[in-house]
């Protein structure tokens, strides 16, 4: 299986779990809002619970504020042709997000960690639509969560990983300096070429990861989950056989 075939497979699988009732042929305002609402849930739900605050009354304000930004990028009305273009866009969206939440009484959620998660996950959801101009998302960042972080810990710079470990690998608490160092390091790792195992039982089955970090996310997000389940199952099976006095599985 090629990386493109695997990406197509994982995108379709992701769409079935997320948007069964959505029409993925039309990236209209309603669907863009849906992408943002799901991204906000990914970014803010846990922080809102811990901070005892509610952000959902602001959903319509947030979606209306960012709608045109995301539509213009996803449809390539706004061209993103260089890495610097995306970095400038990211910073504009980040500043707008932080300002909007802070000015509406949600200072506890006005954190960089939440902003980067909202931006990156929105682009991931947008990528799923047929009329999204995917080449315009080629410089997007890797969304950070438990599974993509597990992947990064296998391949990333040890010094940067140690800094991340100091905050318990909590993406919500990441600062801008560490975040940018991680994203730059991921670019460096991918540029060297990674043949990534895609079969838990047979690690020799591998696929070359692309340079597009959203596409990488679709692959490793699912595979790392499978790895986790597989390794836990092996551990339980070994424990069971050990108790029976059987040396080999």
Roles of regions detected by a PLM:
Residues 1-37, 90, 98, 102, ...:
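C-terminal accessory module of base-excision DNA glycosylases/AP lyases that mediates lesion recognition
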Residues 41-104:
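A glycine-rich, hydrophobic loop/mini-helix early in the fold
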């Amino acid at each position: 299986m090629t990386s493109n075939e695997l990406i197509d497979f994982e995108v379709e699988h992701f769409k079935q779990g997320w948007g069964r009732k959505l029409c993925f042929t039309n990236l209209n305002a309603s669907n863009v809002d849906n992408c943002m609402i799901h991204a906000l849930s990914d970014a803010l739900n846990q922080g809102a619970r811990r901070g005892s605050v509610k952000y959902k009354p602001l959903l319509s304000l947030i979606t209306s504020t960012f709608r045109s930004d995301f539509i213009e990028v996803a449809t390539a009305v706004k061209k993103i042709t260089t890495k610097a273009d995306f970095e400038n866009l990211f910073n504009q969206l980040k500043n707008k997000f932080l300002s909007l939440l802070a000015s509406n009484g949600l200072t506890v959620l006005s954190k960089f960690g939440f902003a980067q998660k909202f931006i990156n996950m929105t682009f991931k959801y947008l990528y799923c639509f047929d009329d999204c101009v995917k080449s315009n998302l080629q410089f997007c960042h890797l969304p950070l969560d438990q599974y993509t972080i597990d992947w990064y810990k296998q391949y990333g710079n040890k010094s940067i990983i140690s800094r991340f470990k100091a905050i318990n690998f909590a993406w919500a608490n990441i600062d801008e300096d560490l975040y940018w160092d991680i994203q730059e390091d991921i670019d460096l790792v991918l540029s060297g070429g990674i043949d990534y195992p895609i079969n838990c039982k047979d690690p020799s089955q591998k696929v070359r990861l692309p340079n597009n970090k959203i596409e990488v996310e679709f692959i490793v997000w699912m595979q790392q989950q499978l790895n986790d389940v597989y390794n836990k199952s092996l551990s339980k099976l070994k424990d069971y056989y050990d108790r029976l006095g059987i040396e080999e599985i």
